[in-house]
């Protein structure tokens, strides 16, 4: 086996590298080329990048394509640009907008990995005769019986496992992540050593297809109904004011709600059907149980084989937080997760990712998208009562 756990000598092993134009994927290409692999660089043009071509911190924009091409020339590897714009719009941008219209908080990076990078690009890599597809993600993979498993990376600050939970077993077996054992400073140092022009390039930020980070503009253009005005209602039923579209709000939001109040108020629920933004005290956000859809289970054995009393593991519902103790249950086709410590501000559409433990070497057990959450009994009762009321215009 070679350094990528593949049979054969590196020079007889073709690897397609997904090159975004950033320092991480560039270093992956450089490392594999230096080891003697037959490396082919591929960059995807994913969206109409005119507004983001020269925006600092953008991803997959025109400048990124140029950077990937220059790095490939420096390394002496072939490089191809594939136009996936239409596919990206249908698989990522449109569902992103539809999710917001439904009052959810989507994570487009997960959808992109699941439906474009690790599906279409992977198929392209196989068509090119590649033995594996390598990316610059900070995550590790390793042998696990006859297959491979995902593990958190050495650099916890760069952990991208949250965005890769939907990767299927077949995809994991074909993918390689050479940066999983490195820190970001080490990666930049390697780029400097190799003389790559992207060594000091700023990391991509926010959502790649949203110019200036204003996702509400994109959603309003694609789904005008999301900008329809409606009521801002207290969880106790009082109408406090009006809003200019639920797309401007997210669960847990405090600032910019647009109403004056003598108490701190947070967005606790988005009622898309009634174009209603529900606000309340912080305690109304507390959640101890969530239900998942589109579950991707990467543990050993079928999901249905977990113990009747549940499986103790660790979970995280935000990419920036460490995994916390939880219990996974699967009953009659319904997947739920009980959070031992509770969480605030959980929104439908977000991901819940499962792990073996909370350490840097934790195995990734997959996860799912949050369908709904259970609040405290009082908050649940108030939301149920409020849902039965029709929308109303506040008194002048």
From Swiss-Prot:
Record-stated family: Belongs to the MnmA/TRMU family.
Keywords, comma-separated and alphabetical: ATP-binding, Cytoplasm, Disulfide bond, Nucleotide-binding, RNA-binding, Transferase, tRNA processing, tRNA-binding
GO CC terms, sorted: cytoplasm
Organism name: Mesorhizobium japonicum (strain LMG 29417 / CECT 9101 / MAFF 303099) (Mesorhizobium loti (strain MAFF 303099))
Interaction with tRNA, annotated site positions: 137, 350
Enzyme class: transferase
Location(s) in or outside the cell: Cytoplasm
Protein's name in the database: tRNA-specific 2-thiouridylase MnmA
Catalyses which reaction(s): S-sulfanyl-L-cysteinyl-[protein] + uridine(34) in tRNA + AH2 + ATP = 2-thiouridine(34) in tRNA + L-cysteinyl-[protein] + A + AMP + diphosphate + H(+)
Cystine residue pairs: 112-208
One of the GO BP terms on file: tRNA wobble position uridine thiolation
Tree of life domain: Bacteria
Gene: mnmA
Active site per database record: 112 (nucleophile), 208 (cysteine persulfide intermediate)
Sites where the protein binds ATP: 18-25, 44, 136
Source organism phylogeny: Bacteria, Pseudomonadati, Pseudomonadota, Alphaproteobacteria, Hyphomicrobiales
PANTHER family for this protein: MITOCHONDRIAL TRNA-SPECIFIC 2-THIOURIDYLASE 1, TRNA 5-METHYLAMINOMETHYL-2-THIOURIDYLATE -METHYLTRANSFERASE
């Amino acid at each position: 086996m070679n350094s990528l756990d593949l049979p054969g000598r590196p020079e007889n092993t073709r690897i397609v590298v997904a090159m975004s134009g950033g320092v991480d994927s560039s270093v992956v290409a450089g490392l594999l080329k230096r080891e003697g692999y037959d490396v082919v660089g591929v960059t995807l043009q994913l969206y109409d990048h005119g507004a983001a071509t020269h925006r600092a911190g953008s991803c997959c924009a025109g400048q990124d394509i140029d950077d990937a091409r220059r790095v490939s020339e420096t390394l002496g590897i072939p490089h191809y640009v594939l136009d996936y714009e239409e596919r990206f719009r249908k698989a990522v941008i449109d569902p992103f907008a539809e999710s917001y219209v439904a009052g959810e908080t989507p994570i487009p990076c997960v959808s992109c990995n699941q439906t474009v990078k690790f599906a279409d690009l992977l198929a392209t890599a196989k068509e090119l005769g590649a033995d594996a597809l390598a990316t610059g993600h900070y995550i590790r993979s390793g042998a696990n019986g006859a297959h491979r498993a995902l593990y958190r990376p050495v650099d916890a600050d760069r952990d991208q496992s949250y965005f890769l939970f939907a990767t299927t077993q077949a995809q994991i077996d074909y993918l390689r992540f050479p940066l999983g054992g490195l820190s970001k400073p080490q990666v930049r140092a390697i780029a400097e050593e190799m003389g790559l022009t992207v060594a000091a390039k700023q990391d991509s930020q926010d959502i790649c297809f949203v110019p200036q980070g204003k996702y509400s503009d994109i959603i309003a253009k694609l789904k005008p109904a999301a900008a329809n005005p409606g009521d801002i209602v207290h969880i106790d039923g009082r109408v406090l004011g009006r809003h200019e579209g639920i797309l401007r709000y997210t669960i847990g939001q405090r600032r910019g709600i647009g109403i004056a109040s003598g108490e701190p108020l947070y967005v606790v629920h988005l009622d898309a059907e009634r174009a209603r933004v529900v606000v309340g005290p912080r305690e109304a956000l507390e959640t101890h149980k969530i239900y998942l859809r589109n579950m991707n289970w990467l543990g050993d054995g079928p999901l249905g084989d977990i113990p009747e009393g549940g499986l103790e593991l660790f979970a995280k519902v935000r990419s920036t937080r460490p995994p916390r103790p939880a219990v996974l249950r699967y009953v009659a086709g319904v997947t739920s997760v009980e959070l031992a410590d509770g969480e605030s501000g959980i929104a439908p559409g977000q991901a819940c990712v499962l792990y073996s433990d909370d350490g840097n070497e934790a195995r990734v057990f997959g996860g799912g998208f949050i369908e709904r959450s259970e609040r405290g009994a009082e908050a649940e009762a108030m939301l149920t009562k409020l849902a039965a009321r029709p929308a109303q215009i506040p008194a002048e």
